[in-house]
């Protein structure tokens, strides 16, 4: 067999297939070796990865801190919610007792009755002041536009003199605690008057 025949035989075809694979593996090995021989690049890549992890962890910790602060603040602000709501019933009863005494009777009352009335009024003021120190605020809606977030409409009163949906009577005062409604104010609202926008334009 001549040399030319050997070059064109089956072995030559096999060698032709193997050579690209060997060359590719050689190139890959060379690239890996190049990376292994460049410690600076490896350290930079590792540093970038660690920095990314650190930033993510810092962001998570900051979010956790904010949530914790908010939860603690809410716990402090609204811890007395149930107690305050119960005390509102006591305050209502004190006010009813005061209002039950006619004005004429107050004027003509003897010293003992006058002292009793003043004592009940003082107790009511002290209770409301204590609730206020704990974030409970009284809603004073008379004359304001009806707001379903803070007011509960009990009835309508025909009144063409004031803008429609204006609170003209307070049946039971409402209260808020922090940013929340502890109890909506029960009110009567006007109907038959001009719309609020029209009334404001007329005033302007």
Swiss-Prot record:
It holds the Pfam family GrpE. GO terms for molecular function: adenyl-nucleotide exchange factor activity; protein homodimerization activity; protein-folding chaperone binding; unfolded protein binding. This is Protein GrpE. It is found in: Cytoplasm. GO terms for cellular component: cytoplasm. Residues 23-41 have a biased composition (Polar residues). The gene is grpE. Residues 1-42 are annotated as: Disordered. Keywords: Chaperone, Cytoplasm, Stress response. Homodimer. Belongs to the GrpE family. It comes from the Bacteria. CDD domains: GrpE. Participates actively in the response to hyperosmotic and heat shock by preventing the aggregation of stress-denatured proteins, in association with DnaK and GrpE. It is the nucleotide exchange factor for DnaK and may function as a thermosensor. Unfolded proteins bind initially to DnaJ; upon interaction with the DnaJ-bound protein, DnaK hydrolyzes its bound ATP, resulting in the formation of a stable complex. GrpE releases ADP from DnaK; ATP binding to DnaK triggers the release of the substrate protein, thus completing the reaction cycle. NCBIfam families: PRK14140.1, PRK14141.1, PRK14150.1. InterPro entries: GrpE, GrpE_coiled_coil, GrpE_head. The keyword 4Fe-4S does not apply. GO terms for biological process: protein folding. It comes from Allorhizobium ampelinum (strain ATCC BAA-846 / DSM 112012 / S4) (Agrobacterium vitis (strain S4)).
């Amino acid at each position: 067999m001549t040399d030319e025949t050997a070059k064109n035989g089956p072995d030559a075809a096999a060698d032709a297939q193997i050579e690209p694979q060997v060359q590719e593996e050689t190139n890959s090995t060379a690239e890996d070796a190049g990376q292994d021989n460049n410690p600076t690049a490896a350290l930079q890549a590792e540093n970038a990865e660690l920095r990314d992890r650190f930033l993510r962890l810092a962001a998570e910790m900051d979010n956790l801190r904010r949530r914790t602060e908010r939860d603690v603040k809410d716990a402090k602000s609204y811890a007395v919610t149930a107690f305050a709501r119960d005390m509102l019933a006591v305050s209502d009863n004190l006010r009813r007792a005061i209002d039950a005494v006619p004005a004429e009777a107050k004027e003509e009352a003897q010293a003992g009755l006058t002292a009793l009335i003043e004592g009940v009024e003082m107790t009511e003021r002290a209770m409301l002041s204590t609730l206020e120190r704990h974030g409970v605020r009284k809603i004073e809606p008379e004359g304001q536009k009806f707001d379903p977030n803070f007011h509960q409409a009990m009835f309508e009163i025909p009144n063409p003199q004031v803008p429609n949906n204006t609170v003209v009577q307070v049946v039971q005062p409402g209260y808020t605690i922090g940013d929340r409604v502890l109890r909506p104010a029960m009110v009567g609202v006007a109907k038959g008057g001009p719309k609020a926008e029209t009334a404001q334009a007329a005033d302007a």
